[in-house]
From Swiss-Prot:
Gene: rpsR
Cited SUPFAM superfamilies: Ribosomal protein S18 (SSF46911)
A matching Pfam family: Ribosomal_S18
Biological source species: Ruegeria sp. (strain TM1040)
Keyword Ribosomal protein among UniProt keywords: yes
Protein name: Small ribosomal subunit protein bS18
Alphabetical list of InterPro entries matching this protein: Ribosomal_bS18, Ribosomal_bS18_CS, Ribosomal_bS18_sf
A cellular component annotation (GO) from this entry: cytosolic small ribosomal subunit
Amino acid sequence: MAAKPFFRRRKVCPFSGENAPKIDYKDTRLLQRYISERGKIVPSRITAVSAKKQRELARAIKRARFLALLPYAVK
């Protein structure tokens, strides 16, 4: 009898749905969840964010960095 292949459950985008949070450059607490300890933007394959929302998220993070709400790099 062969073993069943391992099935990894597909993650759902945290920004899709009715009561999903809006991506806003002023919401630094939300944006910090999608930045690594070194200050880099975490890729969507790890965070399970859809491609469209990942672009919005990256734009919001870059805007917040430009306005000095978020750091560019962490020491």
